[in-house]
Design a protein with these regions (language model features):
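Flexible, solvent-exposed loop/hinge segments and secondary-structure transition points
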Residues: 2-234
Length: 234
């Protein structure tokens, strides 16, 4: 075949497209198991972080298996629909939050460590200023007091909304309460400068008002779904 012809050029280009596509597809398939494993490890690290257990990618799985003694899926009525630990871990909040509340799967992770006691860990997911925000809230044995919290984000502004992931912002959540003395669900409300004296409120991130409001909505929308479960567990 004449290598200078248009036909040759077309065939050569077509073959190269097929070859490159095949290589990229193979690479993607080869990397996917590792990418999935990394996501699993990161999620387990974040669950542990909500109960103040420090972990690394190397020991996160071991610590998760040791301290997360049980995992449940409950519904909005507070009923347990599954106690399969693996199934609970795989629940995708992004998908679940798009469903009607009546059919939504609500994951609960049960932590227990000698000297610390049992805590419930609840995942949360919502919207920040520039993209999704998410995290985990751990509850004391009274099922109304927050033991710990961890939040993360996809694209909030560094130094502003991104501060929701920093330890300084997270620390004041410990001891906050999502039910009042009468047992009415309050969640946590966004305030400016007075949250330290209010057990049902948190301070906004300086310069990150939109992200803070998104966090407030995330806590309200997600934690309210667990109201009956938390009350039945007391």
């Amino acid at each position: 075949m004449n290598t200078q012809s248009n036909t040759y050029t077309f065939l050569y280009a077509a073959i190269m497209v097929v070859v490159v596509a095949a290589v990229l597809s193979f690479t993607s398939l080869s990397l996917k198991p590792r990418q999935n494993m990394n996501k699993e490890i990161e999620k387990k690290q974040n669950i542990l972080k909500a109960v103040n257990v420090a972990s690394t990618p190397a020991n996160a799985v071991e610590l998760y298996d040791k301290y997360i003694v049980k995992a449940l899926i409950v519904n909005v009525e507070g009923e347990t629909t599954s106690n399969d630990k693996s199934e609970t871990f795989k629940v995708d909040l992004k998908k679940e939050n798009k469903k009607d509340l009546a059919v939504r799967k609500l994951p609960v992770f049960v932590f227990n460590k000698e000297g610390v006691g049992e805590k419930l860990i609840i995942p949360v997911r919502g919207k920040g200023m520039w993209g999704p925000i998410w995290g985990f809230i751990s509850m004391e044995s009274d099922r109304k007091t927050i033991f710990g919290a961890t939040f993360d984000h996809q694209g909030e502004t560094p130094g502003l909304g991104a501060e929701i992931a920093n330890a300084e912002f997270l620390a004041p959540f410990t001891g906050k309460q999502i039910f009042d003395q009468a047992g009415v669900f309050t969640s946590l409300k966004l305030v400016k400068g007075t949250a330290s004296t209010n057990p049902h409120a948190f301070d906004a991130v300086s310069g990150g008002t939109v992200t803070s409001k998104g966090l407030e909505a995330m806590l309200q929308d997600n934690l309210s779904s667990y109201e009956k479960f938390l009350k039945s567990s007391k």
